[in-house]
Amino acid sequence: MKKDTLLEKIKDLSDLDKHQEIIDMIEGLPTEQLNNEIIGQLARAYINVQNYEKAIEVLKSIEKDEKNTMLWNYRMGCSYFYLKDYEKAEEYFLKAYNLEPEDENIKDFLMDIYINLSKQVKFGEDDLDNQKKALNYALKAKDYMTTDDKKIECYSYLAFLYNKFTDYHTAEDLLKRAISLGRDDLWIHSELGYCLGELNKLEESLEHYLRAIEIAPSNTWLLSQIAWTYRCLGRYEEALKENFKALDLGEKSEWVYVEIGYCYKELNNYDKALKYYLEANKISKDKNVWLLSELVWLYNGIKKYENALEYLKKLEKLGRDDSWFNSEYGFCLIGLKKYNEAIEKYKHALEKENNLKEIIRYNSQIGFCYRLLEKYEEAIENLKKVLEKINGNKKNDKQMRRFF
């Protein structure tokens, strides 16, 4: 078969995706009919049937003559790319790029190679070296963007990285660029909503979360994020509505119960706040210090001091021993009429407090306990300390007197 006829036959079979027939035909040819172009077509056919190792073997048989051609390097790069050996693929595609820098297919492969190399880098929160390595690969990908679709892909991935590295301003810019180029899906609006939330641009964050929920109305993570955003904006009724949607869809998580409880607390509905906080605590099994502290505060607030004491003891087991904890403990003990114990807790709180307003409040409570114990001399001495604190802080004298 003449060379031109053979190449035409190969082209026709390739157009019909009959790549195995191409392989069988070329491998059945006598040696004298083979040349580098035909062997290159054999390698191409092996790539198309996903036998990349064989493609590399075939290409290496003509390496001496073809290693400085774009097509040979392109095919070697393709083979290594699909074998996920991205470093080798990079080597060959860079050679191909240097030979034909305007070829868009080469640029597309290089962009994909650098994104994949970036994804292969494993890093932790404090692993700055590997974070930088992952980012540098992704920034290289940016040099080879071609179409709007490739720009969207690259900007989106870079934004994902910058969000992970908490560089939310850069992530915001990249996500908005991707949207301006036409990306309008669940991921992009969820990612931008999260990013804007971290930047405290809550109204704008909400817009993107609401667009995302239009696309995926049953996405419980989105519903909880929308609820959280409403809650941060002080729109507690709307937050509750979204949290209950998530709950109805089966998202019976500690997070959702806590958010519902928090909203009810802010709406001064302490009974309902307690109900949902207690549901959350069943899940956390008395391990969430913040949640136990909220329960203490609520029980103290509705004068259920025995219940408050129960959760104070749980907090104590977890090691909480700051000024807030001791002051709440003291308040609870006053409610239980255990004034001497309350005094000790407030004294302990004072040892850990630097805020003048709180120091004055704790001393006032100690004085109050002494008065209830009919230890009037001690009460007077303690209240003198309060006055000394007030008068000793001339800058805030007026404010502190008003507080006292």
Residue ranges, per PLM feature:
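Start-of-helix register in tetratricopeptide repeats
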Residues: 4, 37, 71, 105, ...
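Hydrophobic/aromatic packing residues within the alpha-helices of TPR/SEL1-like helical repeat arrays
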Residues: 19, 26, 52, 59, ...
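Canonical positions in the second alpha-helix
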Residues: 28-29, 61-62, 96, 141, ...
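Short coil turns that delineate tetratricopeptide repeat
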Residues: 33-34, 66-67, 101, 146-149, ...
